Amino acid sequence: HEGMKDVDVIIGSERYVQYMADYLGIDHIVYDEKRENMKISASLIKGDVIRYWDYLVPAVKRYYVHHICICGSESTGKSTTCKRLEEQYGYVMIPEIGRCLVGKSELCSMEVLQKIYDIHYRLLKAVHEDPPTPIILWDTDSITTLSYFSYIFRNVPLVQIRGYKDESEFTEHELWHEVIKADKYFFFESNIEFHDDGTRYSESEARLLSMNHLQAYAFFGIAPEIVTASDRYKVIEQYVLNKITALLKDFCERK
């Protein structure tokens, strides 16, 4: 009984709860024994955690979830890869907010970048607190937005993206700690055919932007895995499948 000496009551949905309580000499509560309120057992969840992910409490989801950020310069296949994975496997994807709000990259205003950063931050915070799927795909992130900010407004303090005038109000150190980070970063290199849909920088500018992005990630202590393969989807898909296999193994082995 050494490991149970501080336990006063045992709670569960099966009859063995009573037997354990009698043996230990403590109180017990048996609830929903006929599974009228919760029509699923822990054994079912353990047997297929992907299918029954929604039944896990947020704290457990946060332990098992894996956040994958796909970053890189323009026209490198980030959105295409994320959308294909979302459609194929049903994992939640956080979209590239800038593409939703900006007509052309080089015409992006400071106010729009501030809005993009804020929306991205709120979305990432939400999926961090209660992950809706075991794999969360990020089509870029807040660091990419910060990189655009520093690239377009070269002499403006980075903290202005949060609405502060200078570092006397909010420091870059505070900004560093505020940024939400993924578990894995893939950086798509600018070595595939460039497609300009009318909203992007020129190909030469996109390559300069790529270097700026990598410097931004380095500033935040992140060294993304560089992807140069032409079939980028396959690279990320294999990584996702390996992570899911590891998750299932880990979940099943826990008592």
What are these regions (language model features)?
Residues K115-I180:
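Glycine-rich phosphate-binding loop used to anchor ATP phosphates in small-molecule kinases
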Residues H1-H67, C71:
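Classical nucleotidyltransferase
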Residues K83-H128:
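Conserved substrate/cofactor phosphate-moiety recognition/catalytic segment
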Residues K78:
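Conserved lysine of the Walker
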Residues E74:
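The conserved Walker
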Residues F153-R232, L248:
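A glycine- and Lys/Arg-enriched "phosphate-lid" helix/loop adjacent to the NTP-binding pocket
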Residues G47-I68, F219-K255:
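Charged phosphate-binding loop/patch that engages nucleotide di/tri-phosphates or the phosphate backbone
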